[in-house]
Amino acid sequence: MTIIQSSIRINASADKVWDIVSDLDNEPKFWKGTKEIKNISKEENKVTREITIAFKDSKCMQEVTLEPKRKIQAVFTKGIIEGTKTIELIPVENTTEVEVIWDIKLSGLMGMFTGMIKKHIKNGTDQALESIKQEVER
């Protein structure tokens, strides 16, 4: 498995940050690697969805669990990516640390491109966090 980590400090409460990051349908606005989302089902704090990612317009299935105002965990259940993407909110005084951890591997022949895709995911995550910060702090 490949671990990719990134974090950013946002000058806002965890509640305010949560309002942005928990809007799963708005994910492509911040996460450029996510091109399209199709929700399959939703029950309580769990969403099953199909996402289209930027890499060759590949489709992946995810089960996303929301722990309100604390954590979002997306488990890739089908597609070229296996593993998880976790977004955690950590209140620090009057600010919020947003930490993203990808724990993934690429399935099949895609494994050959792990290094290139890891760099792409890291850059995309950094860019997403910066965009989220700008949106929240507006």
Describe these PLM feature segments:
Residues M1-E44:
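Hydrophobic ligand-binding cavity/cleft-lining segments
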Residues T2, C60-M61, D103-I104:
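Short, flexible segments with low predicted structural confidence
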Residues R9-S13, T52-A54, T65-E67, T77, ...:
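Solvent-exposed residues in well-ordered beta-strands and their adjoining turns
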Residues A12, Q73, G115-M116:
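Short, contiguous strand/loop micro-motifs
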Residues S13-D19, I121-G124, A128:
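Short amphipathic alpha-helical segments
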Residues P28, K38-T84, E97, Q127-R138:
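Glycine-rich portal/gate segments that line the openings of hydrophobic small-molecule binding cavities
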Residues G33, C60, N94:
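Residue-level signal for beta-strand positions within conserved beta-sheet cores that form or flank
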Residues T77-N123, Q127, Q134, R138:
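Beta-strand/loop substructures that line and gate deep hydrophobic ligand-binding cavities in soluble
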